[in-house]
């Protein structure tokens, strides 16, 4: 039985993760952690999500809980995740990281920690999105430099980073397939007199509105035709189930930095 801890357990995604763990065979929720100043500290994690009492109370200190879990699932904020990363590294605990918005330097910290503990880090844990990444690689290689490529994403009003981690990952996959450096060819939004579109650039457009869980479209546009690869999520549960699947997959894995493509056997 894989003992799973959920960080940010009182938040929207944290509550969904608690539900997903409760539904997963071979997994048990053994710890739930949130901010130390949360008014919900001490509450039963099961009651937070309508499951009734499960005997796991919401804690405010990850370091005090390290003996209670095998793997930590963290969908929080880069600054929080990096602190948790150090705790897990020192304790030899595996991690599943769904936090987005890391800088290049911060991602390097994940890579360094993965030399000592197994980590699954993905911008998106949806099976459908990861299938789309595979399709995007194929589409980019087939369509090549004859198309203009734009990535359009939409999320709820509360999302704090833009473009989304998933949109950026999609851009990386396309750029890698075409032998381009995304940092050099990405164009983030357009305004005013921008001039004609530069060939070989990859454009990003962002929408933040309502309660949109997550929509992503990659547009390959040529003269006379276009190909669109789209994924739309209607529930956070799809991400939560993928994260729990990753946590179970990490059992007996050697230290390394994995992603959802590894979990799904798509490599």
Swiss-Prot record:
Catalyzed reaction equations: (S)-2,3,4,5-tetrahydrodipicolinate + NAD(+) + H2O = (2S,4S)-4-hydroxy-2,3,4,5-tetrahydrodipicolinate + NADH + H(+); (S)-2,3,4,5-tetrahydrodipicolinate + NADP(+) + H2O = (2S,4S)-4-hydroxy-2,3,4,5-tetrahydrodipicolinate + NADPH + H(+)
GO biological process: diaminopimelate biosynthetic process; lysine biosynthetic process via diaminopimelate
Record-linked PROSITE patterns: DAPB
Gene source species: Ectopseudomonas mendocina (strain ymp)
Binding, NADP(+): 35
GO cellular component: cytosol
Keyword Heme included in the entry's annotation: no
Residues at the catalytic site: 155 (proton donor/acceptor), 159 (proton donor)
Annotated NAD(+) binding sites: 8-13, 34, 98-100, 122-125
Known role: Catalyzes the conversion of 4-hydroxy-tetrahydrodipicolinate (HTPA) to tetrahydrodipicolinate.
Record carries keyword Amino-acid biosynthesis: yes
InterPro entries: DapB_C, DapB_N, DapB_N_CS, DHDPR_bac, NAD(P)-bd_dom_sf
EC nos: 1.17.1.8
Annotated family: Belongs to the DapB family.
Gene3D superfamilies recorded: Dihydrodipicolinate Reductase, domain 2, NAD(P)-binding Rossmann-like Domain
Protein name as catalogued: 4-hydroxy-tetrahydrodipicolinate reductase
Localization, UniProt: Cytoplasm
PANTHER family to which the protein is assigned, alphabetical: 4-HYDROXY-TETRAHYDRODIPICOLINATE REDUCTASE 1, CHLOROPLASTIC-RELATED (PTHR20836:SF0), DIHYDRODIPICOLINATE REDUCTASE (PTHR20836)
EC class of the enzyme, as a word: oxidoreductase
Keywords: Amino-acid biosynthesis, Cytoplasm, Diaminopimelate biosynthesis, Lysine biosynthesis, NAD, NADP, Oxidoreductase
Record GO terms (molecular function): 4-hydroxy-tetrahydrodipicolinate reductase; NAD binding; NADP binding; oxidoreductase activity, acting on CH or CH2 groups, NAD or NADP as acceptor
């Amino acid at each position: 039985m894989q003992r799973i801890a959920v960080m940010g357990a009182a938040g929207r995604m944290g509550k969904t993760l608690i539900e997903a763990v409760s539904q997963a065979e071979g997994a048990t929720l053994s710890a739930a952690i949130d901010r130390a100043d949360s008014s919900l500290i001490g509450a039963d994690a099961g009651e937070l999500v309508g499951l009734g009492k499960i005997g796991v109370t919401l804690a405010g200190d990850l370091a005090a809980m390290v003996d209670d879990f095998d793997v930590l699932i963290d969908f929080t904020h880069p600054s929080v995740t990096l602190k948790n990363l150090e705790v897990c590294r020192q304790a030899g605990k595996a991690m599943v990281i769904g936090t987005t918005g890391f800088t290049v330097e911060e991602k390097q910290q994940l890579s360094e920690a993965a030399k000592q503990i197994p980590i699954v880090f993905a911008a998106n844990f949806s099976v459908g999105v990861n299938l789309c990444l595979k399709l995007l690689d194929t589409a980019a290689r087939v369509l090549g430099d004859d198309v203009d490529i734009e990535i359009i994403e939409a999320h709820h009003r509360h999302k704090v980073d833009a473009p989304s981690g998933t949109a950026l990952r999609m851009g990386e996959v396309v750029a890698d397939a075409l032998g381009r450096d995304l940092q050099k060819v990405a164009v983030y939004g357009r305004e005013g007199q921008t001039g004609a579109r530069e060939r070989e650039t990859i454009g990003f457009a962002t929408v933040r509105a309502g309660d949109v869980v997550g929509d992503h479209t990659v547009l390959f546009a040529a003269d006379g035709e276009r190909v669109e690869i789209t994924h739309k999520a209607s529930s956070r549960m799809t991400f939560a189930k993928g994260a729990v699947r990753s946590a179970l997959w990490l059992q007996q894995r050697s230290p390394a930095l994995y992603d959802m493509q590894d979990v799904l056997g798509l490599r």
